[in-house]
Amino acid sequence: MKKLLLLSAFVILSCQDKKIDSTFDFDQKNYSEAFQLIEFWLEAQKDYDNLPGLTAMIADQDGMVWSDAFGMQNENEEMNIENTFSICSISKLFTSIAIMRLVEEGKIKLDDPIEKLLPWFNIDNEFKESKPITIQSILTHSSGLPRESNHPYWSYPEFSFPSKQEVIEELKNQQMLYPSSKYYQYSNLGLSLLGYVVEEVSGDSFDDYITKNILEPLLM
């Protein structure tokens, strides 16, 4: 029903009695009607997906041209454009770029075993015929590692993401799912380990490395 109402609203707004100006300069930054549609759609999408709140922005080559916040950040406060969110798996993009930068600089190789770079790595591997768990096998989600670290951080809001030390301590209680480089298995644990590789090899914290080598050069 909500999708039908949303579609109807778009049709009504699109069919308003307007003359089309064939001389319109598409370089003009007059996006007010588009922004109105975006705001309406985001508000409806928030309700349809039962989201408590969200923020959104649009930017072009000259900077931000539109932003807005919708819903609540908690029971008493409305969302605002300054609210921050965990980017979760988007961090895999930055991790992969950082790893490939270190490869290009000759500091690591794609076929380096993870044990070479993280001496504390000690997961139980019953597959004696398994190939080494390499940087490449982790990047391609074919390492044989479990999907998650041994923590319930997806279970309830009060469970935060595990610290590096917690990941290290729990590795010995986890097992490989299959021999490395044999099957595909999405692994958040694997990409977390590559984040630790970035720290070990560069000497910087993950946040500092990403900021200095990716975000700042891109003026982000």
Language-model features: locations:
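Sec-dependent signal peptide recognition
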Residues: 1-7
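Active-site SXXK
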Residues: 39-42, 56, 62, 85-114, ...
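C-terminal motif of bacterial Sec signal peptides marking the signal peptidase cleavage site
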Residues: 13-14
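Acidic/histidine-rich, surface-exposed loop or edge segments in extracytoplasmic proteins
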Residues: 19-26
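Active-site helix/loop module of the DD-peptidase/beta-lactamase fold
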Residues: 86-90, 104-146, 150, 173, ...
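Extracellular/periplasmic catalytic domains that process cell-envelope and extracellular macromolecules
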Residues: 49-50, 78-79, 109, 128-133, ...
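Short, conserved catalytic-motif segment at the N-terminal edge
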Residues: 29-87, 120-123, 169-174
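Short, charged, amphipathic alpha-helices and their helix-cap/turn boundaries
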Residues: 38, 65, 116, 155-179, ...
